[in-house]
Amino acid sequence: MTPFVVEFLGTLLLVSGGVFGGPLLAVAALAIAIAFGGKVSGGHFNPAVTFFHYMKGDLSQTKTLWYLAAQYCAGLLVYFIYKL
């Protein structure tokens, strides 16, 4: 899988865990996401972490924008599922 798909799925797990299950499930979902996708994408799964790595110089501007787009799309998808 590409890093962007991994970021999308990891963020989807993290936000879904927080919205539908609470903090403990969110932490468990984050641990699962990092275990399965951390080596592919770096395991950011959070726009703040991605922005930090961009400011630190670890990510290019293009890669940062793609990561952020994947993370925001995952968050929006959880929002729309929640509103159903």
PLM features per residue range, with description:
Residues M1-L84:
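Membrane-interface helix-loop junctions and terminal tails of multi-pass membrane proteins
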